[in-house]
Amino acid sequence: MKIGVIAIQGAVSEHVDALRRALAERGVEAEVVEIKHKGIVPECSGIVIPGGESTTLCRLLAREGIGEEIKEAAARGVPVLGTCAGLIVLAKEGDRQVEKTGQELLGIMDTRVNRNAFGRQRDSFEAELDVVILDSPFTGVFIRAPGIISCGPGVRVLSRLEDMIIAAEQGNVLALAFHPELTDDLRIHQYFLNKVLSC
């Protein structure tokens, strides 16, 4: 089994490390690979789109042909996790700022996103979050974080902060406004692995 982390931009090594630790906790053998070019996504049983700069990320995904591969994989039921900028990339629709920058969103999740819902880089913060899929609060690390303004009927809201949706899932696709990979808490990566292992 192979799990891929999109490695063209963003917090890549942290996700790779978190996934490897989560797999080790379970005693499951799987390869965690960095995806830097076309052709690797179709081999993966799970895909992670990390945080970073969403405009750059969207452009590189389109240019490298990786974006189309992610769309095809998600349509086949392959679990996909997007964090921070990854939440934006997965969305069907963006706010005016997203439209202005001409970002090519993948449209995998029936969501409309606010690109800088929680401010810019200097407004980074941590918050204790109630997340539906977890039995106790999770420390969310927010860095120039986006948020989900609205979502379609097929989307399950997992967490909110200040009336903004910050975590949601739609079938095999999971999107988070925060960075679970920047904490030692592996529960969200374990939840994602549950999806991967049950496919």
From Swiss-Prot:
Catalytic activity as recorded in UniProt: aldehydo-D-ribose 5-phosphate + D-glyceraldehyde 3-phosphate + L-glutamine = pyridoxal 5'-phosphate + L-glutamate + phosphate + 3 H2O + H(+); L-glutamine + H2O = L-glutamate + NH4(+)
UniProt GO molecular function: glutaminase activity; pyridoxal 5'-phosphate synthase (glutamine hydrolysing) activity
Pfam families the record matches: SNO
Superkingdom of this protein's organism: Archaea
Pathway: Cofactor biosynthesis; pyridoxal 5'-phosphate biosynthesis
Entry EC number(s): 4.3.3.6, 3.5.1.2
UniProt entry keywords in alphabetical sequence: Glutamine amidotransferase, Hydrolase, Lyase, Pyridoxal phosphate
PANTHER family: PYRIDOXAL 5'-PHOSPHATE SYNTHASE SUBUNIT SNO (PTHR31559), PYRIDOXAL 5'-PHOSPHATE SYNTHASE SUBUNIT SNO1-RELATED (PTHR31559:SF0)
Function: Catalyzes the hydrolysis of glutamine to glutamate and ammonia as part of the biosynthesis of pyridoxal 5'-phosphate. The resulting ammonia molecule is channeled to the active site of PdxS.
Alphabetized NCBIfam families for the sequence: PLP_synth_Pdx2
Protein name stated in the entry: Pyridoxal 5'-phosphate synthase subunit PdxT
Name of encoding gene: pdxT
